[in-house]
C-alpha cells in the first residue's frame, strides 16, 4: 500500500476556477512551481519546506527548466516569459521578455531545447526565446490554446492546439 503525504500547500482552502496545470520543476535540491494562485513558489526538495514565494509578476502555470537546471522559466498573464536563477537563496529574476501577446493565461508547459525556450499561447501562438531572453520569433498558427510540445527521434519539435491542429516546428 502506498501512502501519499502532502508536503506543502499555499494555505488557501479556496478552489481556483482556472486552468491548473501545475508541473513541478526540480533543480539544485529545490522544487519550483507556479499554481493558479499566480505565485512562484520554491520548496526544499528533501523536506517540502517553503523556501520562498514571489508574486511580483502575474505568473501562470506555463513553466520549464533549462537543460543545465540553472534557470526556471515561467510565463506571465501579461504575455511575458521570465527566467529566474535556481541557485539563488531568494527569488532572483534574470530577465523578462515581452512576447507581444498581451493578456495571456494558457498553461501549456514550456519546452526547452538547445538553449531555446518554446511557449504556446491561448490564441494559437508559438514563440521561441533564447536562454539570454532574446525573443527569436513569435508566430500565429491557429486560433486556440496550445496543449504541449514533443520532440521526435529525428529532432523535430511538434506542438498541438485545442482545436485539434498539429504543427511541426523546424
Residue ranges of each PLM-predicted region?
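Short, small-residue-biased leader/transition segments that mark boundaries at the very start
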Residues: 1-3
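Repeat-blade elements of multi-bladed beta-propeller folds
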Residues: 10-40, 54-82, 101-126, 143-167
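Short, positively charged, low-complexity/disordered linker segments
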Residues: 125-128, 136-137
Amino acid at each position: 500500500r502506498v501512502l501519499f503525504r502532502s508536503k506543502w500547500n499555499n494555505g488557501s482552502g479556496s478552489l481556483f476556477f482556472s486552468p491548473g496545470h501545475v508541473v513541478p520543476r526540480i533543480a539544485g535540491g529545490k522544487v519550483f512551481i507556479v499554481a493558479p494562485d499566480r505565485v512562484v513558489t520554491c520548496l526544499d526538495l528533501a523536506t517540502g519546506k517553503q523556501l520562498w514565494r514571489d508574486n511580483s509578476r502575474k505568473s501562470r502555470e506555463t513553466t520549464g527548466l533549462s537543460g543545465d537546471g540553472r534557470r526556471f522559466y515561467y510565463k506571465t498573464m501579461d504575455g511575458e516569459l521570465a527566467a529566474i536563477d535556481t541557485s539563488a537563496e531568494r527569488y532572483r529574476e534574470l530577465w523578462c521578455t515581452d512576447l507581444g501577446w498581451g493578456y495571456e493565461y494558457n498553461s501549456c508547459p514550456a519546452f526547452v531545447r538547445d538553449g531555446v525556450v518554446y511557449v504556446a499561447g491561448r490564441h494559437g501562438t508559438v514563440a521561441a526565446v533564447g536562454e539570454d531572453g532574446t525573443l527569436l520569433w513569435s508566430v500565429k498558427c491557429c486560433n486556440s490554446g496550445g496543449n504541449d510540445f514533443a520532440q521526435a527521434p529525428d529532432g523535430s519539435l511538434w506542438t498541438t492546439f485545442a482545436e485539434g491542429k498539429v504543427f511541426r516546428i523546424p
